[in-house]
Amino acid sequence: MIRRTLILCAVAALSGCGTNLREVGKEPSLSPVGSGIDGGNTSALYKYPEPPRAPVKKFSLWDDRQSRLFTDPRALSQGDILTVRIKINDRANFKNQNDRSRTANRKLGFDLSAQWDKWSTAGKGAGALNSATDTTADGEIKRSETLELNVAAIVTDVLPNGNLMITGSQEVRVNAELRVLTIAGIVRPADIGAENTIPYERIAEARISYGGRGRISEIQQPAYGQQVLDQVLPF
């Protein structure tokens, strides 16, 4: 029985860190675009109603999809290219302190006595229960991130409601280090500027990754064996 229990505990511990073991030696993977809309169901993107069709007028320069008449056409169809401007300057400072104290005292007593036909019984009892808990927690997070880049993205799909799914990547190699920038998300055509550009904060379900591969990244990462032990050992 004990052996079976130990085996079940070991299997549960390994299954809990199975996902992390797949990322040993790799960067954390991004979730698919659209997974944050309907509980991870990416097919929800195609359930939006289609916009009403605009009447087509021959020999007309106006297009309802283009809100500007005297500017160059913007990305609207599959295969079109637009520029994404990424300018991130985030700073976060969180500090949390929590103190909790609780004391409880419980007392119980009883007295029992009886007499019948020269027989008597008598008894007394008392009990006490004391408990005390004290919890103190203190945490602080400081983070500062700055990133300013431009990357070209291509329209990979047009959703039924007219929104565009885009994806793009950029690779730059400097000596023995390769820098990789990827962008993916959902864009509303009306948010695309006159210069066929869009800021990153206008991209829904944005997935932005900026990392690298090469000698510097290999030195910064712990050894594979150390990463495996960090995920498997429970202490």
From Swiss-Prot:
A lipid is attached at residue 17 (S-diacylglycerol cysteine). This is Flagellar L-ring protein. One of its GO terms (molecular function) is cytoskeletal motor activity. The keyword Signal applies. The keyword Magnesium does not apply. A lipid is attached at residue 17 (N-palmitoyl cysteine). It is found in: Cell outer membrane; Bacterial flagellum basal body. GO terms for biological process: bacterial-type flagellum-dependent cell motility. Belongs to the FlgH family. Assembles around the rod to form the L-ring and probably protects the motor/basal body from shearing forces during rotation. Its main location: membrane. It is a lipid-anchor. GO terms for cellular component: bacterial-type flagellum basal body, distal rod, L ring; cell outer membrane. InterPro entries: Flag_Lring. It comes from Mesorhizobium japonicum (strain LMG 29417 / CECT 9101 / MAFF 303099) (Mesorhizobium loti (strain MAFF 303099)). Residues 1-16 form the signal peptide. The basal body constitutes a major portion of the flagellar organelle and consists of four rings (L,P,S, and M) mounted on a central rod. Keywords: Bacterial flagellum, Cell outer membrane, Lipoprotein, Membrane, Palmitate, Signal. It comes from the Bacteria. Disulfide bonds: none annotated.
